[in-house]
């Protein structure tokens, strides 16, 4: 019943919405030459059952120094007359240290093209991994002779090839054309003809590569010889031209270059990931003529909902509910088809990229968190942001001048609405020239920053990679030869906010250096002013007169790299260069940067937050924001939110209230509005809306200790902050379809925002166990072994929010104007026992703003409640605790403990005193000022330091 209701709601939602974005600007698969060709090829191969790719068994070699298996894949093109054509593709396969499997298929080095004046490399781009993988892997790669990556450290010399066995890798052949590799719990079978891989976890088949024989690599050929190089199942549609209206000038200097491969996820009919798309968390089936999912960073103002169209960011990472994942390491335009086969309990996927190489990392494990952990270990952990940046952000396009900013600042205080960041959009600049200030509006930025700093507040300004022609900054970019070039080698000029613009080439190392120098001058501030941060928008890149709202694919970057090859990592290169600049500038204070990017790729989580882009103030966009934020969270980039309460158009009061109630749970909590909308700072609202929004924002601040602990967990393991229910309860099949209700990390906080108008109640899904309504701590129990649905009251001023039994929440419950002013406040512990009377919770504390935590300057502890006793069990304290405590950690005391009550045998009652064990001594503490009601016990006036081990016996 739960699943049926969800499916009905999804059908109504996605069919009722009227599209806002102009669809005709973006290609459909049938209009994309390489997508159409590969779909046709797949359809024809499925009918003919032919296979043209095989492993040359004689080429297989295993270098014990590298622990990498090398081979050659042969593509045979049959000819009616003369000899068949054979094309060679070098293949490598190896294991990462976490037992993930990486394989690559490249094209044997191409002969230089005969085309005169070619300004790009004729070789396939094989360096996406250098942008996507974390530096620790890149550094390891650079210490070896392997051009891609050094995976295995143990070395062993043996006499016979088939006896090459190490503790990492065992290799054998069981038949003439089948080879077996094993690494811990993971094993791989390589089938030579037709080429195929089968990947096993603990001897269970989890993934089949090329099961459908969709492998297709459009090898290099000239237009004149093309006819002889086409397979019978192929079409020649748009191989050497692009007839799409908005990209018909693409010179396509290397002709067809696409790569494609199919992957079958066994034992699962649920797959997730490949953000960013405005659709359901569980990826849609795209068979039967539907559009594939597209990964291609573009500017989609008022994007369409319920479609597989591309958006601002791309993370080519997908996993199944059977805890198996693939990471398609390719930054080119990419399409992904998905087909669920419930009769065989498997999911078939088809990945198609315009060019580059096939570079895939396959991970397997016991559960989905392990898969996400492996992915973020490879691509880099999400950065630990300043605690201020997980507070509330107030933004609009635009705050007009310094007085406008300071008026917002003072009015927020006057109405007791906390906030930490205020933002300046495009109009703060002088004539839309980045790295400048509009002098009559912001005559003294240092003065403005100083005033904001008094209460610990921060300013974010917009700086985009497009630079107005003919001013100092763009002139230097041109003079230093670090502008992106057109296909003729001239500085590319396109249209964006300033009019005619050029684009900085941050793919270039020297371009990054020049970009950094601009920030060094722009952020030349007194040493004590470290509260200016940056927003990189429009970095897909967005080009108003460009094809599909973005860059022509035949633009040229440094080192003869074509835009076609690196499109989806351009935005990452921009924001990483910006992050490095800010980090360097603030290094004397050791301050952590905060940075927002609109475009992203795998690895962007290392340095930036993001948001869902230019949404609209209506209920459909509120509803879709939840699966969108969830999708990024499970794909390794958790620091994301959506513009509250819609960027474009004016929201109703009801929508504002409901959107703040949903936005409270976004990891990135920002209100933003278009320049043409009415002002909607929270203090301008009429009652009761103003009080509702104020209370929501205050609740976010009360929960900052728990939220910051979640961010720390994510920075260590990649664990989602907004967390799908199926990750916490994978045993229930129905939860794999739920994306309108979620947990906050592993805290036990379970929430379902109201996303439809006129609702005063909602249906929530609860697994077995006890749940406590957050505000009252009133409890109810699901005594069964299955999920139940329960009708929950949800008037406009109430969030459907529960604590799952077995968890402990840490809070600070005093109103302060910003997060900095909360540092000296004590903690409040909320204990929600499970049906056995137990509960556990974690707390992480550092200074919230510097990199001191990387030097061990933090406290990490776990609260354990059982047998009516609360224990504090520290897992880490700083070596120099006294100095660190005084200067950075500030107040580490627990002042109040709240224990939720229930009607079970483990329930407790308030006694005249409690016992405290600390430092080997036991004392009795009176509870005269404490109190009790039907739902909870509140114990006050405590002084329990989280940096010490102690027990409290109730």
UniProtKB/Swiss-Prot annotation:
Top EC group: hydrolase
Keywords, comma-separated and alphabetical: Endoplasmic reticulum, Glycoprotein, Glycosidase, Hydrolase, Signal
Pathway: Glycan metabolism; N-glycan metabolism
Chief location: endoplasmic reticulum
Gene Ontology biological process terms in this record: fungal-type cell wall beta-glucan biosynthetic process; N-glycan processing; polysaccharide biosynthetic process
Entry-listed glycosylation sites: 114, 126, 142, 173, 345, 783, 791, 867, 880, 907, 941
GO cellular component: endoplasmic reticulum; endoplasmic reticulum lumen; glucosidase II complex; mitochondrion
CDD domains: GH31_GANC_GANAB_alpha, GH31_N
Keyword Transit peptide listed: no
EC numbers on record: 3.2.1.207
pH note: Optimum pH is 5.8-6.8.
GO MF entries: alpha-glucosidase activity; carbohydrate binding; Glc2Man9GlcNAc2 oligosaccharide glucosidase activity; glucan 1,3-alpha-glucosidase activity
InterPro entries in the cross-refs: Gal_mutarotase_sf_dom, Glyco_hydro_31_AS, Glyco_hydro_31_C, Glyco_hydro_31_N_dom, Glyco_hydro_31_TIM, Glyco_hydro_b, Glycoside_hydrolase_SF
Localization, UniProt: Endoplasmic reticulum
Regulation of its function: Inhibited by glucose, maltose and nigerose, and by the antibiotic deoxynojirimycin.
Active site: 537, 540, 614
Leader sequence residues: 1-22
Subunit structure: Heterodimer of a catalytic subunit alpha (ROT2) and a subunit beta (GTB1).
Role noted for this protein: Catalytic subunit of glucosidase 2, which cleaves sequentially the 2 innermost alpha-1,3-linked glucose residues from the Glc(2)Man(9)GlcNAc(2) oligosaccharide precursor of immature glycoproteins.
Note: Present with 238 molecules/cell in log phase SD medium.
UniProt record similarity statement: Belongs to the glycosyl hydrolase 31 family.
Protein name: Glucosidase 2 subunit alpha
Lineage per the UniProt record: Eukaryota, Fungi, Dikarya, Ascomycota, Saccharomycotina
